[in-house]
Amino acid sequence: VEITDAHMHVGEFPLFDVRLDKNGLAGYLADNGIATGMIFNPDNALVRETVHEVDNAFGLYWANPKNPDCVSELRDYLADPKFRGVKMHPLLDGYHPDEPFVWPVIEVLIEHGLPALIHCGHPIFTLPWSIEELVTRYEEARIILGHMGHGNIVYIDGAIAVASRHPNVWLETSGMPMSSKILEAVRRIGNDRVMYGSDGPFHQPKVEQLKVQLAGLDPADLVEVMGGTAQRLFFGD
C-alpha cells in the first residue's frame, strides 16, 4: 500500500517538545513508509523552503484569513505546484469558519480546484456543525475535516454525519482514536472520501497507520484510505 499522509507539521514545537525540521523530513517520511507527505506550518516560507528540498513533500498554505494579506499571499503560493491546498485552524487563529473574511479564501480554492484541510473537533470554532455552515455556503468547495472530530464521540459522529450530508466533504483520520469509526465512515460515505493522516510529529505515524489497518477495511478500501483518496484530491491522480 502506497501511503500518502494528508496531515503533517514541520518545524519546532516547544510546547509539545517535538520537532521535525527540513533536514530530518526526508528520513522521517522514509522511516514511516510515507510515499508522499502533505506538510504545513504557520510559517509558510519555511514550508516553501522545505518542499523544494524534499521531493516527496508538498505544502498546504496555512491560511489565517484574519491576515489582510492572506488572499494575495495564497494566490502567490498556489502558483507554485508544490502547494496543493490550504490548512485552516479556526481554533488556533480565533475565528468562526463561516466568517465573511473566510469566503475569499474558499473562492480562491474553488478557482484552483484544491481543498481546504480544516481542523475539526474542538469548541468553540472547530465543531463539525460550525464547519458545515461554510460547507453549505460553498457546495462546490472541497473541504476536509481534519481529525474527523478528534477525540470526542459526539464530534466524531457529527463529522461523519456532516460528510454524509455533503458530497464535498472528506474525513481525515489523524488523532481520532477509534478504528471502528473509520470503518463506519467508509461504509457510510465511501472509500473515496476518507483519508489517512498522522498529525506527525505530534502523533506517531506508525501508530496512526496501525489504527487504520486494524479498522477491518477490505483490502481495496485500505488502499484508497491510506493513499489513493488523498492522491486524487490533492493531485487529481
Task: Locate each region found by the language model.
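Residues at secondary-structure transition points
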Residues: L20, P68, H96-P100, F125, ...
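Conserved, mostly hydrophobic/aromatic
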Residues: H7, L29, Y77, V86, ...
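Active-site gating/metal-coordination segments in enzymes
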Residues: T36, N44-L117, R165, V169
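Mid-to-C-terminal alpha-helical segments outside catalytic/metal-binding sites
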Residues: V1-V10, L15-T36, N191-R193, K206-D237
